[in-house]
C-alpha cells in the first residue's frame, strides 16, 4: 500500500487550493486504509470530498534475473495512457476511467494463455515460449445516489486484451472480461453506515496457435498442474485452439464511518468458475477441465484524526481454495462425439494470507508532514495433485516499513517515500511422484519451487511532485523504483515513471 502526505495550500486562490486538496485527498494514506470498503459502489458516494479528473501517461519496467514463475515471464515493458474522474454534485456521484496499455511480457515459457493467475494450472504451453506483445484496454463507470439515509450505487468495468507473438510458436489470445456490481448502504446513528453489495463477472478467452515453420512447431501441452498434462489431448498441430468460458459472483457486507474516521469492517465472499474447452474438430467444443476457486476476505480497522496527528490500523485475512476437475472421455463415435465417462477432482490449491498495518502521521502548520507505516504479514501456499501424489507447499512471514516526508511551498507539493520489507521462509516441501527430474517439465517445476520458496528483501523509493497553476490545473510527475533480492541469489528490479495533469 502506497502512502503520502496530506497537503493543503493556504494562501493560494480558491481554485488552485481546491485542486491541491483533491490531489492530496486521493493520495491520503489514511484514505487508502479504507480502500477495500469502496468495492461497494454505494460507498463511492462519499469516497472523496473533492472532485478530481486526471489524465496520465506512464511507462513501467520489470526485470527478473530468473523468472520466479516461468509461465508469467521475466518481466515487462509497458507504455500506458490512463484517465479517471470523480465528480460529486448534491446527492449524485459519478466516476469513471479509461485506459490503454501496450508493450511486451518478457520470456514466458510453459504457458501460451493470457491471465495465468486466473486460469492456473489449466493453461496450455510449450518448452519454447518467448516474449509476448499485448494491447490492453480498460473502461469503468459508476453512479451512486443518496435518498435520505439510504444510498444506492452501480458500477461496470470492462477489460479487453489482445496478446500475440510474431515468431513461432505464434499464440493469439483475445480476452473479454466484464464485471458488474451494485450495492446499497444505510446510515445508522450519526457516524456509521452499513452496506451490502453483490457482484458478477463474465469472462471469455480464445487462444489459438500457429506455426509458420515448414516442419511445424513444438508440442503444445494441456497442463493439469504440478507437471501433469493430458497425454491424449496435447498436440502440436497448426491452427489448434483453446477456449475459456467462465465467470464469478460475490457478495460483501461493510461497516464504515461517514467521515472516514472511526471503526470499519468488511466481510466478502466470491466464487470463480471457468471451463477449458477444445473447440476445434474433431473435439467439437469438448470441455477438458473445470476450475472452481472460492475466496473469503475479512477486514477490520480504525482511523482517527487529531489536530496535528493521524492514527490508524487494519487487519486483513484471506482464505482461498482452488479445485480442478478433469473430464474423462471415451473414444469418438462416427459422428466425432466423445462420450463423457466421468469426472475426477485431481488438483487442489489452498492460499491463506494475514496482514496487519499500523499508520501514524503528523501534519505541521508550516507545510511539513511525516508519516510512518509498519506492516506484518503471513502467507501460506499449498498445491496438490492427487494421483500420482504430488505436492508443493511453502509458507512465509515478515514485515516492512514506509517513511514518507512531504512538503508544500506556495503552489508546489513534494512527497518522498522510502520503503522496505522482508519475507522469510518458514516451511517448504516438494513431492513429485513419477516425475522425471531431468525432463524439461520436471526441471521447470523444481526451478519454480526453489524461487517461490525463497525469502525476499525488497526496498525502494518513490517521488511525487506537482505544481498547481492558477487555472485550476496541476501538472504532476510520479516516479518509483524498487529492487528485490531473493535468498537464492535471484534479483528483480521495477521502475515506473508517470506524468499528467489534474483538474
Describe every region a protein language model picked out.
Residues 65, 75-81, 133-139, 172-180, ...:
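Residues that define the transmembrane beta-barrel architecture of outer-membrane proteins
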Residues 49-55, 90-96, 148-154, 190-196, ...:
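Outer-envelope beta-barrel architecture signal
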Residues 6-106:
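N-terminal, post-signal peptide beta-strand-biased segments of exported outer-membrane/organellar beta-barrel
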Residues 230-374:
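Long, internal scaffold/assembly segments composed of regular secondary structure
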Residues 81-87, 139-145, 180-186, 251-257, ...:
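Residues on the lipid-exposed face of transmembrane beta-strands in outer-membrane beta-barrel proteins
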Residues 65-72, 107-113, 164-171, 207-213, ...:
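Outer-membrane beta-barrel translocator domains and adjoining extracellular loop/strand segments
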Residues 57-65, 100-104, 145-149, 158-162, ...:
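Transmembrane beta-strands of outer-membrane beta-barrel pores
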Residues 15-19, 190, 491-503:
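Outer-membrane beta-barrel "beta-signal"
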Amino acid at each position: 500500500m502506497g502512502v503520502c502526505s496530506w497537503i493543503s495550500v493556504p494562501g493560494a486562490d480558491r481554485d488552485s487550493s481546491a485542486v491541491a486538496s483533491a490531489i492530496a485527498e486521493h493520495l491520503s494514506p489514511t484514505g487508502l486504509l479504507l480502500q477495500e470498503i469502496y468495492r461497494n459502489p454505494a460507498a463511492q458516494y462519499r469516497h472523496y470530498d473533492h472532485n478530481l479528473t486526471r489524465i496520465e501517461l506512464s511507462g513501467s519496467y520489470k526485470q527478473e534475473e530468473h523468472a520466479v514463475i516461468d509461465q508469467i515471464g521475466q518481466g515487462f515493458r509497458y507504455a500506458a495512457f490512463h484517465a479517471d474522474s470523480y465528480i460529486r454534485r448534491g446527492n449524485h456521484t459519478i466516476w469513471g476511467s479509461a485506459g490503454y496499455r501496450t508493450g511486451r511480457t518478457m520470456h514466458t515459457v510453459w504457458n501460451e494463455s493470457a491471465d495465468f493467475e486466473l486460469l492456473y494450472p489449466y493453461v496450455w504451453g510449450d518448452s519454447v515460449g518467448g516474449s509476448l506483445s499485448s494491447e490492453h484496454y480498460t473502461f469503468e463507470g459508476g453512479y451512486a445516489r443518496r435518498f435520505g439515509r439510504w444510498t444506492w450505487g452501480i458500477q461496470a468495468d470492462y477489460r479487453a486484451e489482445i496478446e500475440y507473438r510474431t515468431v513461432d510458436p505464434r499464440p493469439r489470445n483475445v480476452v473479454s472480461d466484464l464485471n458488474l456490481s451494485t450495492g446499497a448502504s444505510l446510515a445508522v446513528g450519526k457516524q456509521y453506515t452499513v452496506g451490502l453489495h453483490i457482484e458478477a463477472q463474465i469472462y471469455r478467452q480464445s487462444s489459438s496457435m500457429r506455426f509458420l515453420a515448414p516442419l511445424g512447431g513444438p508440442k503444445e501441452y494441456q497442463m493439469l498442474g504440478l507437471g501433469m498434462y493430458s497425454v491424449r489431448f496435447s498436440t502440436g498441430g497448426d491452427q489448434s485452439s483453446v477456449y475459456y468460458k467462465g465467470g464469478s459472483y460475490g457478495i460483501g457486507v461493510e461497516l464504515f464511518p461517514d467521515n472516514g474516521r472511526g471503526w470499519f469492517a468488511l466481510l466478502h465472499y466470491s466464487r470463480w468458475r471457468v471451463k477449458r474447452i477444445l473447440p476445434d474438430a474433431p473435439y467439437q467444443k469438448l470441455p477438458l477441465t473445470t476450475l472452481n476457486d472460492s475466496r473469503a476476505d475479512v477486514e477490520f480497522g480504525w482511523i482517527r484524526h487529531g489536530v496535528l496527528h493521524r492514527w490508524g490500523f487494519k487487519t486483513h485475512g484471506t482464505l482461498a481454495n482452488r479445485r480442478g476437475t478433469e473430464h474423462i472421455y471415451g473414444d469418438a463415435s462416427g459422428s466425432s462425439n466423445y462420450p463423457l465417462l466421468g469426472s475426477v477432482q485431481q488438483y487442489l490449491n489452498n492460499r491463506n494470507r494475514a496482514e496487519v498495518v499500523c499508520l501514524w502521521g503528523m501534519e505541521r502548520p508550516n507545510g511539513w508532514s511525516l508519516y510512518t507505516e509498519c506492516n506484518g504479514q503471513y502467507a501460506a501456499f499449498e498445491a496438490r495433485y492427487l494421483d500420482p501424489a504430488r505436492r508443493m507447499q511453502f509458507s512465509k512471514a515478515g514485515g516492512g516499513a514506509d517513511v514518507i516526508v512531504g512538503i508544500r511551498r506556495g503552489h508546489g507539493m513534494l512527497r518522498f517515500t522510502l520503503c522496505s520489507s522482508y519475507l522469510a521462509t518458514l516451511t517448504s516441501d516438494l513431492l513429485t511422484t513419477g516425475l522425471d527430474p531431468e525432463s524439461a517439465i520436471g526441471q521447470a517445476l523444481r526451478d519454480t519451487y526453489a524461487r517461490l520458496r525463497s525469502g525476499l528483501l525488497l526496498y525502494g523509493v518513490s517521488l511525487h511532485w506537482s505544481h498547481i497553476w492558477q487555472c485550476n490545473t496541476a501538472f504532476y510527475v510520479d516516479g518509483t523504483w524498487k529492487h528485490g533480492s531473493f535468498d537464492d541469489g535471484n534479483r528483480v528490479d521495477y521502475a515506473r515513471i508517470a506524468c499528467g495533469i489534474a483538474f
